[in-house]
Amino acid sequence: LKGGGDHLYKNNNGYFTEVTTSAGIHGGLISFGLGVSVTDINGDGWPDVFVSNDSYERDYLYINQKNGTFKDEMESWFQHTSFSSMGADVVDINNDGYPDLFTTDMLPLNDYRLKTTGSFDNISLFTDKLKSGFYYQYTKNCLQLNNKNGKFIDIARYSGVAATDWSWGALIFDMDNDGWNDLYVCNGVNRDVTNLDFTDFFADEVNQKMVLSGEKKSVDKILQNIPRTPLPNKVYRNDKD
């Protein structure tokens, strides 16, 4: 399974020209860009781009170089990111005038889900990925608070929004008109492919041969054994602290 990379197109009076490579945007085949936010991160008046990537590819923070190009400075701004970043939103959450960042992931909400889904790397794999150039990525939502000095700090656990299970899009806006931005997270997946019981079932040699045969009936039969996991959406009210 491979992604298609990210693409940037320049508007030329109603016509678009791809400038991905010349602008410094990464377009790797392992990129699964599921979220993008365009905003002025560093306060210089120029729009920057944050891309949240699912699976192994890290997230990217492209800082506008004011000449039609961008530079990835994610490692300079963030100590770590979500492992499988899905949705992302950049909004001021504490009314200090600086943009903050929220990304969604798939950390289960309860102990049962935590123990029945395969959501984490073992330490050996984690270390090997760091040595291979991957970044510090953890299976959890991240709420990156802007420290106003070119750095962000993740306060998701402190704020109670680190775990919302299999989450996709996130929207941060003032839901109750009190002047403070609140958080909405949409959740759920039709078939839970991270279920460890299904993983053991799928590892059976007979089942693997059925899938590799390429016959639709065989594949459908396997997919029917993936459990469904309905999950509620989540809404968090900003307590202003």
Show which residues each predicted segment covers.
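Acidic, glycine/proline-rich Ca2+-coordinating loop motifs
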Residues: 1-241
